[in-house]
Amino acid sequence: MRLEGKVCLITGAASGIGKATTLLFAQEGATVIAGDISKENLDSLVKEAEGLPGKVDPYVLNVTDRDQIKEVVEKVVQKYGRIDVLVNNAGITRDALLVRMKEEDWDAVINVNLKGVFNVTQMVVPYMIKQRNGSIVNVSSVVGIYGNPGQTNYAASKAGVIGMTKTWAKELAGRNIRVNAVAPGFIETPMTEKLPEKARETALSRIPLGRFGKPEEVAQVILFLASDESSYVTGQVIGIDGGLVI
């Protein structure tokens, strides 16, 4: 098993890409600290993970609440002694064209998608530094690379995640901590289910492979970056988009 003995913290762990990653990590023997804002979704996740080789340990976690993050991270380290892998996956959308976007919608997306990644990473990294080992995987988006009309806030947040990924890769390499990002395209998740049919058709027409991706396909790449198989990979942004950005 590729993550046997590893303690892995995943945010946004109870739906979409986060859920698929949590279940895959548990299948690969990890102890998964599943952080999510929804207790109901966490309860469902734990039931689904029953019988897997690893373990799912759920925590209600809001990535905008620094006090709560600190408390959860301290509890995890006290209980398990370490955090080997961090997957920053929690994210939201509040779409609108630039001239119609409300300031509160800008703030909400930036606070979760960008500052939330900063918040959790800043709390976890000191323990990885003490261990002199760790892998951080940030979930960005192809929208952070090429932009998308109606997603000023989302594009800015995901571009910022890429910038932080590359900066942290340089800062932390000397402590044997690797930092990478994935940039999913259109993936079948609760977030993309909200797309109008016309928008879905337009998106599909731009994807060379002719379909939306599955959360499990993103999870497989996150697993590679989290595992020792990618021990010489850091500062990279891996597109998982069916050829969208070719």
Curated annotation (Swiss-Prot):
Record: active site: Y154 (proton acceptor)
Alphabetized UniProt keyword annotations: Fatty acid biosynthesis, Fatty acid metabolism, Lipid biosynthesis, Lipid metabolism, NADP, Oxidoreductase
SMART domains assigned to the protein according to its UniProt record, in alphabetical order: PKS_KR
Residues annotated as binding NADP(+): N62, V63, N89, Y154, A155, A156, S157, K158, I187
Enzyme class (EC, first level): oxidoreductase
BP-aspect Gene Ontology terms: fatty acid elongation
Alphabetized InterPro entries for the sequence: 3oxo_ACP_reduc, NAD(P)-bd_dom_sf, Sc_DH/Rdtase_CS, SDR_fam
GO MF annotation: an example: NAD binding
Assembly and binders: Homotetramer.
Protein name as it appears in the record: 3-oxoacyl-[acyl-carrier-protein] reductase FabG
Organism: Thermotoga maritima (strain ATCC 43589 / DSM 3109 / JCM 10099 / NBRC 100826 / MSB8)
